[in-house]
Amino acid sequence: MRLTFIPSLIGVANAVCPYMTGELNRRDEISDGDAAAATEEFLSQYYLNDNDAFMTSDVGGPIEDQNSLSAGERGPTLLEDFIFRQKIQRFDHERVPERAVHARGAGAHGVFTSYGDFSNITAASFLAKEGKQTPVFVRFSTVAGSRGSSDLARDVHGFATRFYTDEGNFDIVGNNIPVFFIQDAILFPDLIHAVKPRGDNEIPQAATAHDSAWDFFSQQPSTMHTLLWAMSGHGIPRSFRHVDGFGVHTFRFVTDDGASKLVKFHWKSLQGKASMVWEEAQQTSGKNPDFMRQDLHDAIEAGRYPEWELGVQIMDEEDQLRFGFDLLDPTKIVPEEFVPITKLGKMQLNRNPRNYFAETEQVMFQPGHIVRGVDFTEDPLLQGRLFSYLDTQLNRHGGPNFEQLPINQPRVPVHNNNRDGAGQMFIPLNPHAYSPKTSVNGSPKQANQTVGDGFFTAPGRTTSGKLVRAVSSSFEDVWSQPRLFYNSLVPAEKQFVIDAIRFENANVKSPVVKNNVIIQLNRIDNDLARRVARAIGVAEPEPDPTFYHNNKTADVGTFGTKLKKLDGLKVGVLGSVQHPGSVEGASTLRDRLKDDGVDVVLVAERLADGVDQTYSTSDAIQFDAVVVAAGAESLFAASSFTGGSANSASGASSLYPTGRPLQILIDGFRFGKTVGALGSGTAALRNAGIATSRDGVYVAQSVTDDFANDLKEGLRTFKFLDRFPVDH
């Protein structure tokens, strides 16, 4: 089935959203409250504060635990030493099974604020009043790598959000890419087994550049759409703060009276989208594999709270096949030209976890955490996730009571007949754990659509048909939308996609797999397939135009749009302790940029007053812009190793690797970053072969308002794409 865009629908993008017109019904009985304070009040019940306290055993008795109990100073340790046994036993059992996927992650608390009363489209209480606040917890993650892998692996990135609503927990368990690799959850083990390390040698970690991954991709072409997104900048974002988020599946909104709409969830970063380039990501991974979790933590600690807007695309139940594809297919997007996004509210992350394990590691998200006003669809991937995400927690937590952990507890009372199990934290007072009953007034009572504000399934949902094991014919076209994505990228980002696929398949050993990859790419775009083929030693194919089209859609790339905020970006000023003007210049620049949330870091040969870090600990990957200070140009002389030792090379120093200052400048330019120089520091640009006439290169005699404004504009551009060669 070929994706066909309906021209008459394009005008919808400019229409006023019908769900934001007129006076909406109010739910005045719901109070706002201070969601941030509520989070602290709730979690503080579970804090353990060791300040000014004596060491105790797990049962509270004061102890000392620095030496084992032995029979004499040189004798054997005694089995009766309960202090030793407790300490070692607890250490032996500290680890729990890591997540099968999304093991590597970072989280933060925050607040969601509703933009209005949306009770005309959903009965969800957290969207029932303008200004209503709801505590949230978000966990960002990679998918394939283990808990100890790098943040910078090329991967889909998880974006899971929990709303602690006044009607229970609601989770949007999404990603930073709006589609997924497979259409049916029964293929999930096959997908993950294919992308995980080999079973014989556990290689490679957190990478798909190997035979089994691309063998699966080329045999299961539903993967192509997500694959192209992952090979683009979306696979290697600048930070968690600079990604959008998506619910992936189509869900339902349901009103109090049972009317339903189909919706797709979108998180739009109010920082803007930004990505690294591949070599930059690889270097960052080697130098600081915690780069992204550190960026998120540091931004929140500095009070630069990242924000996202939550929106939905709203469609009628009858629209499931309207756009030329199936809304139940999780490998498809709904272009915003077809259905604009209705903004529902804003989320701000403003509080770091106090303990990583207790909060970020123990939090469990699942798409089955929904509330009144939200309902599922028949998306076969979603249906399978509803089982898998709940089931896996039994393995991770060793029992069914994981919802009782503080990070997982709802902020409202829990009343049901579930009892006992390992790790039961509560003391139920109702001895009659069954329903229906006459005791205790029949409590807990049944809540439904009309009584008790209970959850209810959309009344209009129906289904019929024969029992089959088959893919719906409406799911069959898996090439038109990958082409839509590829068509919509700017030339440089198309090149990044091509280079990424070349890199991955250059590591594939099987010529059969490589050839199959080219067959699938050729169904998307002949130029894409040919450019990859010639780099990996496969014959260039003739066009296979069945699914070719020239359609494009907006805002699917990570390049070509400016950042909305500069919060937490870093400018590295490359100076010298031999020239005090370096410190003065960095200080002046810091004053000019601080109101925009930009950090200025002065780098010099050694630590001294005003110097933030040394060249020995610095690389271009740490900065979003690089500026050479006046007087530091002697450190940037082009090094030569012919006919002499490293000590005799120009610009050499025993304080840092030879040529490090010049390398920082060159790499900054190569990675598309803003670069600049002050006064005599422009000589460093010449030594690096960087023309001052290039876009994103700024020079001035001293730090002026114009120079600072140029740097800010360069930071908003983020990557200057003319520095990256494109195939011809």
Swiss-Prot record:
Subcellular location(s) of the protein: Secreted
Cystines in this chain: none
Keywords assigned: Cleavage on pair of basic residues, Glycoprotein, Heme, Hydrogen peroxide, Iron, Metal-binding, Oxidoreductase, Peroxidase, Secreted, Signal, Zymogen
GO cellular component: cell surface; cytosol; extracellular region
Signal peptide, first to last residue: 1-15
Post-translational modification: N-glycosylated.
Highest taxon, organism lineage: Eukaryota
Segments crossing the lipid bilayer: none
Protein EC: 1.11.1.6
Gene3D superfamilies: 1.20.1370.20, 3.40.50.880, Catalase core domain (2.40.180.10)
Record function comment: Occurs in almost all aerobically respiring organisms and serves to protect cells from the toxic effects of hydrogen peroxide.
Family the UniProt entry places it in: Belongs to the catalase family.
Record-given protein name: Catalase B
Source organism of the structure: Aspergillus fumigatus (strain ATCC MYA-4609 / CBS 101355 / FGSC A1100 / Af293) (Neosartorya fumigata)
Gene: catB
